[in-house]
């Protein structure tokens, strides 16, 4: 099958936003106008095309990012609809990793909200160009220019309107195009009849003012345009569009559009902007990776002529076809039935069938080309973040960063029959979602699941019940603490056992130092002269890793520690891997006496919105919960408080806030970082864990 759309005419985009900004409805309208669906499904009626899991339709939020492909103006647009709820941040992160551009959807009444900040920060990390769609212009309190100001104030984004609304709330009836300087007036409810008119007289001054600001902002990103602008020459519409495209692709400028997806206004113009301003796979730098045979860096330009290279970014269990692996092709061509190499695992995989996805329906295709996003059936060993490549041209692409889970709970099957099924169900769910961890407590035999938040674990337990028919009892949520060392120290681990026959002998000296936050555990072998033979070095590292899984204070996993093995001794006959593993774990225990071990707790960035009269209550809540206020701002009659609060103190806060504000207050929280717990709290945690032992 020949390539249908050239790379220049391909767009891979994500739709990202805060929960309830109208993201799924926006995607629905895109599918409607591009001819993919014939009837529009409303999210609040549970009928949306993109929200296809049962829980999504019940809860009216998007949980898994469904991928779909559509056509607009002779271009192919591959769309990934990402969740806006903070507990599903990995879904956003992994889709951003494989996208070329994104549409950030705002609620025009609220502007930038907490989760908008999170996804914006992630998109900036991955260098993803964005356009902004200020949605819900028909909503009471909608304020387009306020929304634009929040992009500047909260995100420090160089964002400028390329459109202005005509009217707002019930009176929202059209859009001013600041490039063409024309008005688009909507005359029916489906948004299909649009009249292009002159800008209404009462909006002309404002339009000219914002057109001038737009031209100046774009000129500042381009030397040639700046010269023309300073010399007073007119910048043509074509030059302005080209300037916006270049600056947007370079992530120096963010065009802002407006509309109401629910009322079918502005979506086609937003689709035009996707084509006009977001990059094709040819506009972004070639993907980099490491050749596993040479350890050299290599690149793969977007071209069908290059060797095949793709990244698996999502695993899903489909009720009809089984395990689906979603992947983005960066270079080359792949045909169904062929073999590829999973370079991350060193395993050969056969591609059974290739499917092009449309929310929850699928079309079988026999070939995918560079720049495409598709799903494969039949891959057994591939997980999220793995590279799939041509067997003769190996490359390992940069993987996907997986955040650490912050909350855990115990699950136990209700019956013996459920026990076996639960193991299989949890394994499959963990394959799909790398932020979901399943562990067995060695001492109690209990199964502990960890994730990014209460809703995250709720949904997974719910899926276990519905999809795998497993009934389970669920314990109360617990915080996922971590442990670390705060001081450097040197420690000896010496293990010797003589009891007739072959003995055991292992002797190591290890220097422990605190590592940078987020760097995890790093091991260095600094042995000189073979005082510890080379074959025992991996056993020392393994002994440390195993011991650090159950830390030195309260049994929580240890993070961010460097260990340097610099001395030791061995016995010709009695030394073994086991002896050196035990010696390493003894060195860690010894180090704990002088390395100032500390317990770390997850700190959440909490954003609380309350009526002005409840501000005092909220400040009291934050202080009482060991939190610290980071900032406040007024928005209408409400106050927005941003604070860092330990997760351990936030359980049950929804009820407290509801009663303090008579149900008018709301809050959002997102994991931010780990921090040392105060000494008094640390002692409590240790006592509690010792008591349980």
Swiss-Prot record:
GO molecular function: GTP binding; GTPase activity; translation elongation factor activity
Keyword Zinc: no
Record-listed GTP binding positions: 17-24, 81-85, 135-138
Domain tr-type G: 8-282
Disulfide bond sites: none
Principal location listed in the UniProt entry: cytoplasm
Keyword flag Transferase: no
PROSITE patterns: G_TR_1, G_TR_2
GO cellular component: cytoplasm
GO biological process: ribosome disassembly
Protein localization: Cytoplasm
Functional summary from the UniProt entry: Catalyzes the GTP-dependent ribosomal translocation step during translation elongation. During this step, the ribosome changes from the pre-translocational (PRE) to the post-translocational (POST) state as the newly formed A-site-bound peptidyl-tRNA and P-site-bound deacylated tRNA move to the P and E sites, respectively. Catalyzes the coordinated movement of the two tRNA molecules, the mRNA and conformational changes in the ribosome.
Family: Belongs to the TRAFAC class translation factor GTPase superfamily. Classic translation factor GTPase family. EF-G/EF-2 subfamily.
Designated name of the protein: Elongation factor G
Species, as recorded: Streptococcus pneumoniae (strain Hungary19A-6)
Gene of this entry: fusA
